[in-house]
A protein has these predicted regions:
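Signature of N-terminal electron-transfer/Fe-S-associated modules in redox systems
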Residues: 1-156
Length: 156
């Protein structure tokens, strides 16, 4: 609160709802999400902490520009009250970054999106629009999924 970084929500206070999700980056280039409400400060030692305030960018005039995930959530009307949205943004951002480092076959995409967002709880709208928005960003971003062409072993 002293830094005016109030976007990370304190909801359940037990790490269950994931509204307080943040991203920790380590020196090796890896990243993982964690619920801020139950993650001790000592665990962050040697890691960089990213909160929802650090996800959007800025244009040359200094105006805030939503990230691809944030814009997709807006475009898909993914949220209603938006209390849980910071946690969903952080989870989806970590997923997109992970796929940028290690793309997956397209056939695994749905399961991977569900796994990434599965711990986040929304009490208003459900999850379909969140999932659709993340899918749209991933499929629109080159290099995140691999189209695997099945070959017939009987040929050639």
């Amino acid at each position: 609160e002293y830094l005016n970084l109030t976007g990370t929500r304190a909801a359940c206070g037990q790490g269950v709802c994931r509204a307080c999700t943040v991203i920790f980056d380590d020196a090796a280039g890896g990243a993982r999400t964690a619920p801020a409400c139950v993650t001790g400060a000592a665990w962050a030692n040697g890691r960089t902490l990213r909160t929802i305030e650090g996800i959007a960018g800025r244009d040359p005039e200094g105006r805030v520009v939503p990230s691809a995930i944030q814009q997709a959530y807006l475009d898909h009307f993914s949220f209603q009250c938006s209390f849980c949205t910071p946690g969903f943004v952080m989870a989806a951002t970590a997923l997109v970054e992970e796929l940028g480092r290690a793309p997956i076959p397209r056939a695994q995409l749905e399961d991977r999106i569900v796994a990434a967002l599965n711990e986040n709880i929304c009490r208003c709208t459900g999850y379909i629009r969140y999932l659709e928005a993340v899918r749209a960003v991933i499929l629109a971003t080159p290099g995140l999924v691999i189209d695997v062409v099945a070959t017939d072993a009987r040929q050639g």
